[in-house]
Amino acid sequence: MRVSIIIPVLNDGKQLIQLLDSIQIWREEGHEIILVDGGNDDKSFITTGHLVDKVLKTSPGRATQMNEGARHANNEILFFLHADSILDDNCIFAIIHELQISNNVWGRFDIKLSGTHWMLRIIERMMNIRSRTTGIATGDQGIFVYREIFSQINGYANIELMEDIEISKRLKRISPPVCLDTRIITSSRKWEQKGILKTMMLMWLLRLAFYIGVSPRRLSSIYYSS
């Protein structure tokens, strides 16, 4: 069983190159890496071609980019990964092993925020507990799913924000997620730049607004203007 690693990118620069360097061992084992460009103007992007199996171009938007990557994937399992992630060497093995021994069709990893502030430790713990309790995953937790199942549900909804929450709700009707305690480290840059408490409150409010029916387009406008 093989995995297609799909990475949507938009001006991710140095973080992207660091990620790609770190996962080359997976290519050697027959897994593929697909980079989906949403309109980069970062010159460092052009140096990454030899580190991936496919480079695709599409309009910006994570949902659009990830769906395009899935459409060109060859392997049985799709693994959607953010460009600012840092991964354990055993991540791919863990995905394959847990899907094979269970009846689950999808899953996600626990998350660790990269910064050292003590509040980030509390936030990441709350995020992991919430995800395990609700069966809802966020994109920075590295969502993985059988390609056949992804195709059956028509992939990510083409919405501007909350595409990860939306697809989780549909996937958990089929099965609960595999919740791997192996951690993906994700950048805490946005938390530190915008303020940890401010960012936490914003994320909670956006999620609440999504659940009560505020449109993803409106939420995207609020998120990016903040």
Placement of each model-derived feature along the sequence:
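Short, acidic, metal-binding catalytic loop of nucleotide-sugar glycosyltransferases
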Residues: 21-30
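Acidic donor-binding loop at a coil-to-helix junction in glycosyltransferase catalytic cores
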Residues: 161-167
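Short aromatic/hydrophobic "clamp" motif used to bind/position activated sugar donors
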Residues: 78
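N-proximal low-complexity "stem/linker" segments adjacent to membrane-targeting elements
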Residues: 1-22
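Hydrophobic helical membrane-anchoring modules
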Residues: 169-226
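A conserved acidic beta->alpha catalytic loop
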Residues: 37-45, 85
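Glycine-rich, basic loop-to-helix element that forms the pyrophosphate-binding segment
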Residues: 57-73
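Conserved donor NDP-sugar-binding/catalytic core segment of glycosyltransferases
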Residues: 90-119
